[in-house]
């Protein structure tokens, strides 16, 4: 199927977000990401450098070793992909609620 004819549910949406919190994506931020991604039916992959993991896996996210300043790309596919990415953008903007 060509990109022009692809439906919104099958066309992957991407967002590149920058980790801004001091400690990066450790266990608590990874759990916060997974809490959001599991609220949605969309499939979500997360990329850092050349590594790609399931966005619904705490261990996968922690294995990315995304420290402060790291660029992380989220790729979501599904009817609710836009809402999922919007919530993730807000979480990153709040620096995972870390002080």
Predicted features along the sequence, with ranges:
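C-terminal binding/interaction regions
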Residues: 2-12, 71-73, 80-99
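Glycine-rich, flexible loop/turn motifs
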Residues: 19-21, 49, 60, 92-95
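Short amphipathic
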Residues: 10-21
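Amphipathic, hydrophobic secondary-structure cores in small proteins
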Residues: 25-27, 31-82
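Preference for short coil/turn "hinge" residues that link or interrupt alpha-helices
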Residues: 16-18, 46, 52, 89
């Amino acid at each position: 199927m060509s990109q022009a004819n692809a439906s919104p549910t099958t066309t992957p949406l991407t967002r590149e977000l920058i980790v801004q919190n001091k400690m990066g994506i450790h266990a608590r931020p990874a759990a916060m990401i997974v809490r959001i991604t599991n609220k949605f039916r969309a499939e979500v992959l997360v990329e850092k450098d050349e590594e790609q993991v399931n966005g619904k896996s705490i261990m996968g996210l922690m294995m990315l070793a995304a420290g402060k300043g790291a660029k992380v790309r989220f790729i979501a596919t599904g009817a609710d992909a836009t809402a999922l990415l919007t919530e993730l953008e807000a979480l990153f903007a709040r620096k995972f609620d870390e002080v």
